[in-house]
From Swiss-Prot:
Sites of N-acetylserine modification: S2
Species of the source: Rattus norvegicus
Topology with respect to the bilayer: Peripheral membrane protein
Region of interest (Involved in PLN binding), residue spans: 202-224
Similarity remark: Belongs to the HAX1 family.
Modified residue annotations for Phosphoserine: S188, S191
Required for localization in mitochondria: region residues: 2-43
Name of the protein this chain belongs to: HCLS1-associated protein X-1
Tagged with keyword Cytoplasm: yes
Length: 278
């Protein structure tokens, strides 16, 4: 079976009148097809008059032409006329071959919905983010939303108490202010109360720095300075004095007699005994 037979069977066209493949040419021909072609040429199964259509020559196997109505027609005996006719009908219904009768117009300023338009002097923050998830009504064009939609004035259910983690509220209690999802005016609150109530207390680390300095004076007195600085910046200095130790412990050399310092005293010690003995 040739590729052309598969293509024709896929689209449901009738079977061929010969074993020759005029559409794909020699791509699917083999030796058996060549022998069949020679036999058919001898028997004259393909008449010369079958090719003469719309001025086509007998040697031509495939062709197409354009009709005045704008359609395209294939010439040949393989059922392409029905295929092209079906495609023309499909695209004509879809409007793919026809241009729009009028050009598209750009929307003008009058196409805007007057209900969504902001009031004069009203900011986008006040209209969109003032009460995002609360049950309080919004204000559009000076009219409350509850007046326009009475059924929307129902209070919103408290989904926080029914959530999957509502049992953890006892462990980590949540204040009512944290549950309220509203866009608060922080500028006026800061100007009135300051940043203290708004900022959450942060945990602080405590540390202490201790420095000790000892000074030994010439008389042997030891002076000790103990300075303690805590995390708050407070400084406390304590000074202690320690008296000198015993002279026998502090001075390793024994005291010398004052007589040894005088040379006459030394001579008196050495020669005095000799003269006194005489």
């Amino acid at each position: 079976m040739s590729v052309f037979d598969l293509f024709r069977g896929f689209f449901g066209f009738p079977g061929p009148r010969s074993h020759r493949d005029p559409f794909f040419g020699g791509m699917t021909r083999d030796d058996d097809d060549d022998e069949d072609d020679e036999e058919e040429e001898d028997s004259g199964a393909w008449g010369r008059e079958s090719y003469a259509f719309d001025g086509f020559h007998p040697t031509e196997e495939f062709g197409f032409s354009f009709s005045p109505r704008g359609g395209m027609r294939f010439h040949g005996n393989f059922g392409f006329d029905d295929l092209v006719r079906d495609f023309n009908s499909i695209f004509s219904e879809m409007g793919a071959w026809t241009l729009p009768s009028h050009s598209p117009e750009l929307p003008g300023p009058e196409s805007e919905t007057p209900g969504v338009r902001l009031r004069e002097g009203q900011t986008l923050r006040d209209s969109m983010l003032k009460y995002p998830d609360s049950h309080q009504p919004r204000i559009f064009e000076g009219v409350l939303e509850s007046h326009a939609k009475p059924e929307s004035s129902k209070p919103a259910p408290d989904w926080g108490s029914q959530g999957p983690f509502h049992r953890l509220d006892d462990t980590w209690p949540v204040s009512p202010h944290s549950r309220a999802r509203e866009d608060k005016d922080l500028d006026s609150q800061v100007s009135q109360e300051g940043l203290g109530p708004l900022l959450q207390p942060q945990p602080k680390s405590y540390f202490k720095s201790i420095s000790v300095t000892k000074i030994t004076k010439p008389d042997g007195t030891v002076e000790e300075h103990r300075t303690v600085v805590d995390s708050e910046g407070r400084r406390e200095t304590t000074v202690t004095h320690q008296e000198a130790h015993d002279s026998s412990r502090s001075d390793p050399d024994p005291p010398r007699s004052s007589a040894l310092d005088d040379p006459f005293s030394i001579l008196d010690l050495l020669l005095g005994r000799w003269f006194r003995s005489r």
